[in-house]
A protein has these predicted regions:
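Interfacial "coupling" helices/loops that link adjacent transmembrane helices in transporter permeases
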Residues: 145-186, 537-575, 636-637
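Hydrophobic alpha-helical transmembrane segments of multi-pass inner-membrane transport and secretion
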Residues: 126-162, 189-190, 194-195, 267-291, ...
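C-terminal transmembrane helical bundles of large multi-pass transporters
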Residues: 497-583, 593-596, 635
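Membrane-helix entry/capping segments
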Residues: 89-138, 159, 173-174, 203-231, ...
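Hydrophobic alpha-helical transmembrane segments of polytopic membrane proteins
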Residues: 225-244, 529, 535, 610-632
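Hydrophobic alpha-helical transmembrane segments that constitute the membrane-spanning cores
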Residues: 187-204, 208, 529, 576-593
Length: 645
C-alpha cells in the first residue's frame, strides 16, 4: 500500500542521478494531519501528449473520500443503458439524492474548469473555442500566404511566359515545360517549409505558453501530422503548376499578352488583394476588441496586485505569525480573516421572481477583521466606516451592490437593519442568544472569478476576535522578493512542521479569466503575422506594378506631373482595395465579436473608434510598404526612365 511510482522528472528532483528504486521518502498531508512514508517501486516515462497530469502514482489511503473513477470499456458500451442499469441496481449515491455523471476523455478534455463533483482535476484540458479560433485564424493566415503567392506569380508571369514561349520555339515539349514549372514551384514551397521549421523552433515555446499547450517539434514529424504536411506541400506545388502549365500551353502567341496584362488578370489580382486586406482588417479589429475586454478584466483584478494569502487551517499560529510580520517595512498592509478571497464560503439562496418562480443564487460570505475592507480596497458606498460599525454593532455586516439589488426593495435604506429582514434563510441559521447581524453599509462588488459569470451577492462580516485561519498580506512591489523571503523565514520559525505556502490572489484571479487572456494573445500573434505577410506581398506587387508603368510615369513627368500626383496615381489602387476590404470585413467581424461578447456578463462595447483604427492600421501598413517604391519612381529622372524603356 505504501509503494509509489514517480515520473522521471519527479524522481530526478528527489534523488538526482541516483537509482530511485527501493528508496523511501515521507509526505505530510496537511489537511489529514498524517505523514506517510512511501517506497519508490517504479519510474514512469514522461509522455508530453498524455491527458493525465501527475508527478506520482500511489494507492488510495484509508482516508480516501471518493472522487472520479476511470472506466475502460469496449466498443459495445452504451452510456444510456449503463446509466439506467446503475439506477435500476440502486448503486449508492451521496445522501441518496446524488447522481453519477459519465464523460468520455474527449468531453473531459474540453470540460469547463468548474469545481464540481464531476470535474476531474488531474487531467490536461483545453478550450474548444480557443482551438477553433486558432485553427480558423491559421487557415486565414494560410489563405493570405496563398493569395500572396498567387499575386506574386501573376506579377512575374509575363517574364515566365516569354521564357516558356522561347523554350517552345526551341523545341521544348509540353511535359518538359510542366516539369520545369512544377520544379520551380516545388522548390519555392520546400524552401518555405524549411524556413517555417526554423521559425517554429523559435516560436513554439511562446505558442505553448499562449495556448497552454505541450507541443514539441517532434510532434510535426509524427504519424498524425507528417502526412498532412507532405500532402499540403504537394498540393501547393502541383495545383499552381498544373494550372499554369495547362493555361500557357493552351494559349497562342497572340493571347499571351492579353492573358498576362489584360482585364481578367487585374480582376483576379484585385479580388485576391481585397480578400487579403479584409482578413487583416478582421484580425486586427478582433484583436483590438478582445484586448479591450482583457483590459477590463485586468482593471477588475488590479485590487489584487501584490496581494498574497497565507492559510493555517489549524488556527494555532496565524495570530502569532501576523503579529510578527506586521513590523516588516516591506509589507504595505495586512488583515486577518476566516475565509479566503478567491475560495470563500458559499451557500445557496433561493429567491422568487414576480411570477413566483424560484431563482437559485450562490451567496458569498467573507469574515475579516476591521482592516479587511481596506486591505481588499473595497469602497464603502453607503453606511458606517469599519471602526464605527464595530463600535455600534456586535456583528456588523456589509452587503455588496449585487445583494442590495436582489434583496433590498428599491428606494429602501437597509443600513442599521437586521440581515434576516431581507434574507429569511439567514434568519434560520442565527442561533438564539447570539448577537443579531446588522447591516452596517453597502460596499462595491468584489469580482473574484471570470467576467463571464454574474458577481455573487455577498455578505462581509467584521470581527475583532479570534480565531482566524488566514492572513492577507499586501506586499510593496519594489520589495516583493525580500518580503516573501522574510515571510517564509518567519513561518518556518513559528510553524516549522507545516511547509510555507501562499496564494497569489492576482494570479488566481487572472487564471480564472485564462480563456480571455489566451484568446487575446493568440489573436495578437495572428494579427502581427497577417500584417507582416500582407506587407511582404504588397512589397513585391508594388515593385512589379511600378516596373510595368515605368514608361507611363516618365511620360507623365515630362508632361508636368508632380511627385505628389505620381504618388497618388500609384497608391490610389491600393487605397481603394483597403476601402472595399474594410466595407466587407467590418460587418462580418462586428457580428462575430458581438456573439462572442454575449458570453460575458460584464463586457466592453464594440466602438466605432476601434473599427476605424483597425482599418487605419492596415491602411498605414499598406501605404508605408507601397510608398517606398512609389516615391522612388516619382522622384526618378524621367529621361533615365524613358531611356531604359
Amino acid at each position: 500500500p505504501n509503494a509509489i511510482a514517480l515520473t522521471e522528472y519527479q524522481a530526478k528532483i528527489f534523488f538526482g542521478n541516483e537509482d530511485p528504486i527501493g528508496k523511501t521518502f515521507s509526505a505530510k498531508y496537511t489537511y489529514e494531519n498524517e505523514t506517510i512514508t512511501y517506497e519508490v517501486a517504479a519510474v514512469i516515462k514522461e509522455y508530453p501528449q498524455s491527458f493525465l497530469k501527475f508527478n506520482a502514482l500511489a494507492g488510495t489511503t484509508s482516508q480516501f473520500n471518493g472522487g472520479p473513477t476511470l472506466l475502460l470499456v469496449n466498443d459495445l458500451f452504451n452510456i444510456d443503458t449503463f446509466t439506467q442499469k446503475l439506477k435500476d441496481d440502486k448503486v449508492p449515491t451521496f445522501n441518496g439524492t446524488g447522481q453519477y455523471y459519465f464523460y468520455t476523455l474527449q468531453e473531459s478534455y474540453f470540460q469547463e474548469q468548474t469545481y464540481t463533483q464531476e470535474y476531474i482535476p488531474y487531467i490536461h484540458r483545453n478550450q474548444k473555442d480557443l482551438l477553433y479560433v486558432g485553427l480558423f485564424s491559421a487557415i486565414l493566415i494560410l489563405v493570405i500566404a496563398c493569395f500572396n503567392y498567387a499575386n506574386l506569380s501573376f506579377s512575374r508571369i509575363l517574364q515566365q511566359v516569354r521564357m516558356i514561349y522561347t523554350q517552345k520555339v526551341m523545341g521544348a515539349s509540353a511535359g518538359q515545360i510542366h516539369r520545369q514549372l512544377f520544379l520551380d514551384t516545388f522548390l519555392t514551397v520546400l524552401i518555405a517549409f524549411f524556413l517555417s521549421l526554423l521559425l517554429t523552433l523559435d516560436f513554439l515555446p511562446a505558442f505553448n505558453q499562449i495556448v497552454s499547450g505541450r507541443i514539441s517539434l517532434g510532434f510535426f514529424f509524427s504519424g498524425q501530422v507528417l502526412p498532412v504536411i507532405v500532402a499540403l506541400i504537394l498540393a501547393l506545388s502541383i495545383i499552381p503548376s498544373l494550372y499554369m502549365s495547362h493555361k500557357i500551353n493552351s494559349l497562342s502567341h497572340s493571347e499571351y499578352k492579353s492573358f498576362t496584362t489584360g482585364t481578367r488578370k487585374r480582376t483576379i489580382i484585385s479580388g485576391l488583394s481585397i480578400l487579403q486586406f479584409a482578413i487583416s482588417i478582421a484580425l486586427v479589429f478582433a484583436t483590438l476588441t478582445v484586448r479591450q475586454q482583457l483590459t477590463l478584466t485586468q482593471t477588475n483584478g488590479e485590487r489584487y496586485r501584490d496581494l498574497i494569502e497565507i492559510a493555517d487551517w489549524s488556527g494555532n499560529h496565524i495570530q502569532t505569525f501576523s503579529e510578527e510580520i506586521r513590523r516588516y517595512p516591506s509589507i504595505e498592509e495586512m488583515c486577518l480573516s476566516r475565509s479566503g478571497i478567491i475560495q470563500f464560503n458559499l451557500r445557496t439562496m433561493v429567491l422568487k421572481d414576480e411570477n413566483g418562480n424560484e431563482l437559485n443564487y450562490t451567496l458569498g460570505q467573507y469574515e475579516g477583521d476591521s482592516t479587511f475592507l481596506k486591505v481588499m480596497k473595497i469602497n464603502i458606498l453607503q453606511g458606517l466606516s469599519e471602526r464605527e460599525a464595530l463600535k455600534q454593532y456586535s456583528t456588523p455586516v456589509y452587503i455588496n451592490e449585487q445583494y442590495a439589488r436582489l434583496l433590498v426593495p428599491k428606494g429602501e435604506n437597509p443600513v442599521g437593519k437586521p440581515v434576516r429582514l431581507y434574507d429569511t434563510e439567514f434568519g434560520k441559521m442565527e442561533k438564539e442568544g447570539e448577537p443579531i447581524a446588522i447591516i452596517a453599509g453597502i460596499v462595491e462588488n468584489l469580482y473574484t472569478g471570470t467576467l463571464r459569470q454574474e458577481v455573487y451577492p455577498s455578505l462581509t462580516y467584521l470581527t475583532h476576535t479570534p480565531p482566524y485561519n488566514l492572513v492577507q498580506v499586501r506586499l510593496k512591489k519594489e520589495h516583493r522578493a525580500e518580503a516573501l523571503t522574510l515571510l517564509q523565514q518567519t513561518w518556518e520559525k513559528i510553524n516549522p512542521n507545516v511547509p510555507f505556502e501562499y496564494q497569489d490572489i492576482y494570479e488566481e484571479f487572472m487564471l480564472s479569466n485564462r480563456k480571455t487572456i489566451e484568446l487575446a494573445h493568440l489573436l495578437i500573434m495572428y494579427s502581427i503575422i497577417s500584417l507582416l505577410l500582407t506587407a511582404f506581398g504588397l512589397f513585391g506587387m508594388a515593385l512589379y506594378a511600378i516596373q510595368q508603368r515605368t514608361k507611363e510615369i516618365g511620360i507623365r513627368k515630362v508632361n508636368g506631373a508632380t511627385a505628389g500626383e505620381i504618388l497618388y496615381l500609384l497608391n490610389r489602387r491600393f487605397i481603394g482595395w483597403v476601402g472595399i476590404a474594410f466595407a466587407i470585413a467590418v460587418p462580418i467581424t462586428w457580428y462575430s465579436l458581438s456573439c462572442w461578447l454575449e458570453n460575458f456578463v460584464y463586457r466592453v462595447d464594440i466602438s466605432i473608434g476601434t473599427c476605424l483604427l483597425s482599418g487605419g492600421i492596415v491602411l498605414m501598413v499598406t501605404l508605408l510598404t507601397v510608398s517606398r517604391h512609389s516615391y522612388k519612381a516619382a522622384s526618378r529622372n524621367p529621361v533615365n526612365a524613358l531611356q531604359s524603356e
